[in-house]
Amino acid sequence: MFKFSELNNDQINYINIGLMLVSCVLAFILPFELFLFSYAVLGPLHYLTEIGWLHKKNYFTKGKYDFVALSFLCVLVFYFSFVQPAKSNTQVPNIIAFGLLIAAVFVFVKDNLYRAVLCVLAFIGLALSTTGNTYFVWIGVFLPTIIHVFVFTWAFMLYGVLKNKSLSGYLSVVALIVIAFSFFVIKAPALQYQVSAYVSKSYELFGLLNKYLIDFFGLTAPINNDTVFNTNPGFIVMRFIAFAYTYHYLNWFSKTSVIKWHLVPKKTLFITLALWVFSVVLYIIDYGIGLKALYFLSFLHVFLEFPLNITSFQGIVKSVFSFKK
């Protein structure tokens, strides 16, 4: 077994602030390159280790096999993304929304009859609802990406801080918001930054996220590929995205007391590392191939984390109301 000294909460919090600063500096200098590196190298290891940890925690749900339903929804997302393209731009967002709704059912309801009724009602409600472009953007684009890596990470941190009530924890939660805000208020000096053809081609499948974020923050109009890769508004948003993803991964790896690397069986650790190396090699061979090959795993960790996200917000609400008593 590997030996790791377990860090206390204050040490982890200060390390996290340091990781935020490092991620911030790199995001200012090489935003596209940082994102592509983090997504290809840190991402797969994060998916594998977090899913393993969630499995040990029964995915924070009340049913033993709830993860099967969430996993099946990921299969549908993959199918309608690559095998049989969705017939409308609400099909995949509806699957994601349904996953979030049934995750809430799995967290709060134990009785199987009530669960079944609520899941059916959620399905019918989504099927009958009238949605537009805003729904597609927030559920189909933002929820599994920037909301997952930034908002849910912040909520998970805040939940832990409210339980431990440490000054260093509060500082880390505030630091995350301040640093994210800095990308929109600090005018970076001219770094003669240009996006190479390889980088722009590798990133093209993510471009929709940038376009909608540029529009959401009202940075410029019209918005096209040139806006994303060659303008200051495009760089501002890309810096924020690169920082959010990179720190999301680093935040997870810093939690040695959660992952407990030293307690992971050698066989499990070897399989995890072998799959991780294989994933990274795919990205090196062709970034597009790696992205498509890991698409299911990426979405799987998003769906399986929904119950934890809901639990985090539940804990935050309980803590806030307990302060008022």
Residue ranges of predicted features:
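N-terminal signal-anchor module of multipass membrane proteins
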Residues: M1-N58
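Hydrophobic core of alpha-helical transmembrane segments in multi-pass integral membrane proteins
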Residues: I17-L26, V68-F82, I96-F108, L118-T130, ...
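Transmembrane helix interruption/hinge and helix-loop junction motifs
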Residues: A27-L36, P85-N89, S129-V137, L282-L291
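Hydrophobic core segments of alpha-helical transmembrane domains in multi-pass membrane proteins
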Residues: F35-L45, V92-L101, V137-V149, A197-Y198, ...
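Membrane-interface helix-loop-helix junctions at boundaries between adjacent transmembrane segments
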Residues: K56, F82-G169
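Aromatic-rich transmembrane-lumenal/periplasmic boundary elements in polytopic membrane proteins
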Residues: S168-G207
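Membrane-interfacial catalytic/cofactor-binding modules of polytopic membrane enzymes
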Residues: Q192-T246
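Extracellular/periplasmic helix-loop-helix junctions in multi-pass membrane proteins
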Residues: S196, T231-G234, I259-P265, S279-L300
